[in-house]
Swiss-Prot record:
It comes from Azospirillum brasilense. The keyword Methyltransferase applies. Belongs to the N(4)/N(6)-methyltransferase family. Keywords: DNA-binding, Methyltransferase, Restriction system, S-adenosyl-L-methionine, Transferase. GO terms for molecular function: DNA binding; site-specific DNA-methyltransferase (adenine-specific) activity. The keyword Methyltransferase applies. It comes from the Bacteria. Coiled coil: none annotated. It catalyses: a 2'-deoxyadenosine in DNA + S-adenosyl-L-methionine = an N(6)-methyl-2'-deoxyadenosine in DNA + S-adenosyl-L-homocysteine + H(+). This is Type II methyltransferase M.AbrI. Its EC number is 2.1.1.72. GO terms for biological process: DNA restriction-modification system; methylation.
């Protein structure tokens, strides 16, 4: 018996975001380096972006928009949060994100509070009121 996917034991000790494949809403969990992601569980690591800030982006309406546009919708309205869809989400270069927006993203991701994540992402992408409304919020 052997797995299809290659096992990287060092990944266990890395901080990462864990994302289940099939979910109704984005369910992005910060993992501090104690668990290994197994089947149907995607992971994201980053040496550049703060993972809590990235968690806020992935919990926001913008991530759901990207995934819902590209993903196959499963029975019951569930979306597949697969790697190929998550890769389509464009994030700015972390070094170009203003310090105040960085902190807002990190704080929102750490809670995690969907409304706070959306507000931080609205600021990150400098979204208009119309764009914010399309994603389900006004940023207030």
């Amino acid at each position: 018996y052997r797995t299809i996917d290659r096992i990287y034991p060092a990944l266990t000790r890395e901080h990462k975001l864990l994302i289940p494949d099939i979910k109704g809403e984005a369910h992005i969990v910060y993992e501090e380096g104690r668990l290994y992601p197994h089947h149907n569980l995607y992971y994201i690591t980053s040496e550049i972006w703060d993972l809590r800030a990235l968690q806020a982006v992935l919990l926001s309406g913008i991530a759901r928009l990207f995934v819902s546009v590209y993903s196959t919708k499963m029975h019951g309205g569930f979306l597949r949060f697969q790697a190929q869809y998550l890769r389509r989400i464009r994030v700015p270069n972390w070094s170009q994100v203003p310090a105040a927006v960085r902190q807002e993203l990190i704080t929102a991701g750490a809670k995690p509070d969907l409304a706070a994540c959306n507000r931080a992402v609205f600021a990150l992408y400098a979204m208009t009121a119309e764009e914010r409304a399309a994603l389900g919020g006004n940023g207030d």
